[in-house]
């Protein structure tokens, strides 16, 4: 990865603060990668893609860096729960055997596990050695007939957030747009003009949380072409260029993907959340608006009215117990404001919220929810 390519990812045009006098994301401070390096960010972003073999090229310690710590659930394959590594040691470094070990590792994985694709994550040691990941990937792909993709995000490149963007950049350039989506099933109850395809970016299906939202989209005739990357499938992500709209769920991680897809394919996008009643209703309304279907807007409003009424009844006993209680959130990123909204729906008062990985846009949302004097915890 060249230095100018890294700087380009840090200078994100879609960030509002990028248009101020001082543009670009802040450079990492010494010790910042203790909270997650670029490799960690790349792996945690793509690991939920369930039918891909995720191979860490480096010492075995790197393989455990962020394996499965997001808790993303899969409705099908579980290949992503297997940890693969080339386990480089001192002798491999001295003798220059890294590339050969990597090639044989890919061939072994494909022969034994039959993945939809193999993602190879670069780490500090082979990056400093100068291993040619692209050449090995091309040779392995030719030998196996399976897509082999290099994720060049060695830890010393920068922060965890940079790793998120590096991983997303690879998906845009090498994966998305490589396949056409399957036709809608003949058994669908929706007329052709009522069918809509969307993409989800930065949605990780933590503990299966998105499965509570999926039935609402199904009822509206909205198909999720691909999710980057919760409960994701490699072939589905390849079709995301055909989405009519994209929803960005975690802006800090993959805002560059939403912006790039808009530039390349003209796909409109918005940032939203499925945490809390108000946020979920707003997200559904924004989706319907972006899709530009008046009939869908009407059906969306009817669904929201029905579901909000049901939620109000279900939450009433809890509101009686929780109303006026104080809560302190120590989360970060998109959850620094989205969970505030959910707790306020229960009548609770949020006295402070963590903003360790939050953007300026996230902080503005916090102020809108908690007031201009909102207490934000930057460090912890």
Where are these regions (language model features)?
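An N-terminal assembly and electron-transfer interface module characteristic of large anaerobic redox
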Residues: 1-380
